[in-house]
From Swiss-Prot:
This is Granulin. It comes from Cryptophlebia leucotreta granulosis virus (ClGV). It comes from the Viruses. It holds the Pfam family Polyhedrin. The keyword Cell inner membrane does not apply. Belongs to the polyhedrin family. GO terms for cellular component: viral occlusion body. InterPro entries: Polyhedrin (IPR001746). The lineage of its organism: Viruses, Viruses incertae sedis, Naldaviricetes, Lefavirales, Baculoviridae. Keywords: Viral occlusion body. Component of the virus occlusion bodies, which are large proteinaceous structures, that protect the virus from the outside environment for extended periods until they are ingested by insect larvae.
Length: 248
């Protein structure tokens, strides 16, 4: 029996029998069309926002913005942290800070030797477990706008903390909005009077952080804490001369 075009349609009303592939489409093609339609709708929503956003320049990470990063490592210390509790990292009261199990002070002199303008100040915390094969995460809580006369507790209970970032390193930006740091030779102030360096030089222009760290372990853990301050310095001149030769 040959092909008869009239056989494509059933004699029963409301039903259709399709013989050729002219009206058929694969399910993958249908889903692809739906996805493209959603993409076009999403692009149409963002077009006016993108036109405005293109007028501004921002950095992906403020830490990687313009300027030179100068690190000063304050101390390394081993602390014992109990389960479900968090310990204060640094109380900013003189060079003793919070000495516990073992403490080593790193930077004896300030690494910046000339008058500089500080753009940003970062509090960097590096945490490491002291015993191998320990499966727990580091937790953290901090406050920036505490009253200067507030006396922080050494130990607090964990309540809704967040996990420390990748590689167990966390950075906190201490910059105050609307406060410009003056040109200062920080090395002389740091070396002359370390105890008053923070209260007289840093905290009037930057936040004084109260940082607590803990673990998710159910046992008492010994952790290594390394505390550093990262100064982002505005570079007025390059570190190396632009020209070399007998005339310079």
């Amino acid at each position: 029996m040959g092909y008869n075009k009239s056989l494509r349609y059933s004699r029963h009303d409301g039903t259709t029998c399709v013989i050729d592939n002219h009206h058929l489409k694969s399910l993958g093609a249908v889903l692809h069309d739906v996805r493209r339609k959603k993409d076009r709708i999403r692009e149409a929503e963002y077009e006016p926002i993108i036109d405005i956003a293109d007028q501004y320049m921002v950095t992906e990470d403020p830490f990687r913005g313009p300027g030179k990063n100068v690190r000063i490592t304050l101390f390394k210390e081993i602390r014992r942290v109990h389960p479900d509790t968090m310990k204060l990292v640094c109380n900013w009261s003189g060079k003793e800070f919070l000495r516990e199990t073992w403490t080593r002070f790193i930077s004896e002199e300030f690494p910046i030797t000339t008058d500089q303008e500080i753009i940003d100040l970062w509090f960097e915390l590096q945490l490491r477990p002291m015993h191998p094969n320990r499966c727990y995460k580091f937790t953290m809580q901090y406050a920036l706008c505490a009253h200067p006369d507030y006396v922080a507790h050494d130990v607090i209970r964990q309540q809704d903390p967040y996990y420390v970032g990748p590689n167990n390193i966390e950075r906190i930006n201490l910059s105050k909005k609307g406060f410009a740091f003056p040109l200062t030779c920080l090395q002389s102030v740091y070396n002359d009077n370390f105890e008053n360096f923070f209260d007289d030089v840093l905290w009037p222009y930057f936040h004084r952080p109260l940082v607590y760290v803990g673990t998710t372990s159910a046992e008492i853990e010994e952790i290594m804490i390394e505390v550093s301050l990262l100064f982002k310095i505005k570079e007025f001149a390059p570190d190396v001369p632009l020209f070399t030769g007998p005339a310079y």
